[in-house]
Amino acid sequence: VHKWGEHDLVSAIVQEPIGLSAGRMAALQLSKGEWVAITDIDVRPEPNWIEELLNSSQSQGDENVMAVTGRTVFAKSSDTVSLIRSVEIESKYRSRPRITSLANGPCSMFKRECLLNVGGFNPEWYHAEDMEVSLKLIASGGIIVYSPDAVVNHVPETGIGRFLSKRSRDARAHVRIVRNYPSKNRKRPGFD
């Protein structure tokens, strides 16, 4: 990490293991650009990922684009869970509209000033921080655009135990989102 930080345009942040959301917030606060992109450790962005996000960042008409989200492709392995998960995610992205309600954590870019104005990433959220900031951006009058050509490749998700553990974590996060952001208070109640 320190080696990457030696580049003129790169800053390396070293901190205690205090969580993904806290790490994202630290990076957001130190960032200087108009747009800030985020990804996850278990994905590999395609070489043109940032370019594709930027190509989709222009507002059309009276839109106020505050975030652009790409497409996550789950790699397949011989494991049944991996095959099911990759098909499930592929199906989800196939029917996703251009204006969407979620800037996915592994593959999104945010207008820095807008993200800071809504409070950025809450370090107390252990999971679903992407969902929370998405709802806040939409509530502030922004939109999130889906850019299907901005691709990141996710490592295969294998093993039933790991799969169930992650889905349990997702369920807890969804409950927390619904509790803190009930559908009656959201501009677009659906999650896609």
State what each model feature region is.
Residues D40-R44:
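The conserved acidic donor/metal-binding loop of glycosyltransferases
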Residues V151-D192:
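Active-site-adjacent helix/loop segment of glycosyltransferases
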Residues Q15-S31:
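Glycine-rich, basic loop-to-helix element that forms the pyrophosphate-binding segment
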Residues S108-F110, C114-G119, E124-V151:
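A short, conserved alpha-helix in the catalytic core of glycosyltransferases
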Residues V36:
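Short aromatic/hydrophobic "clamp" motif used to bind/position activated sugar donors
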Residues F74-K76, S91-F110, Y126, E132:
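A recurrent flexible, glycine/aromatic-enriched loop bordering the glycosyltransferase active site
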Residues V1-V14:
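Acidic donor-binding segment of Leloir-type glycosyltransferases
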Residues N48-T80:
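Conserved donor NDP-sugar-binding/catalytic core segment of glycosyltransferases
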